[in-house]
Amino acid sequence: CSHGVRPATQTVSLTQSPQDTILVIKLTPNHQKVSTTMEYEHITHSFEPIYNEDSEILILGTLPSVKSRENNFYYGHKQNRFWKLLAKLCEEETPQTVEEKTAMLLRHRIAIWDVIQSCDIKGSSDSSIKNVTPTDLKQILDHCQIRQIYANGNKAGALYKKYQQPLTGREILVLPSTSPANAAWSLERLYEKWSVIH
């Protein structure tokens, strides 16, 4: 990454970035603008799906975010509402550990995975995803009585419809994303839409 620092009051002239970079402007505590470029990375999914033979609901995301990869588990960003929302739907306390999260999913017959096995992506930006290799959902669908598949967000839904639906023949119901990038949706609004799963 390249870094350039100028006083906040100074006019900054930006040239167009190359196709595979995105320019991010941040305001630092001392009121200086820092411009950084974020390049594409090739990411391979490193988590196993969470399910067992009793799973009836499958929730699919896109790909683990940077924070999720750092924490080595699904929906690891502190501002992602997934675990808080799911706990509310299941009438349980919000789980904190990987073991608690996994146990809650399996208790309520919920399976989770993602639609992307590998891709090129800038940071955690779903809109930048390209060169997708999809996950093989057969390992779940062939071993569970999944009655409904849900997408956590529009991007996951679109990718499923493009890559997996022609193979599975199964429809997907797209739910609003729990990502912090979808901050316009409050937890209460998400709860109303997501209540269909439980």
Model-identified regions with their sequence ranges:
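Short, well-ordered alpha-helical microsegments
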Residues: 156-160
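Short, surface-exposed acidic-centric catalytic microdomains
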Residues: 67-128
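Acidic, Ala/Val/Gly-enriched low-complexity intrinsically disordered segments
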Residues: 5-8, 12, 20, 24, ...
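Cationic, low-complexity basic patches in intrinsically disordered or flexible, solvent-exposed regions
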Residues: 17, 27
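Short, hydrophobic/glycine-enriched beta-strand segments
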Residues: 56-62
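C-terminal capping/extension of enzyme domains
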Residues: 38-56, 78, 125-134, 138, ...
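Internal catalytic-core helix/loop-beta-alpha segment
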Residues: 107-155
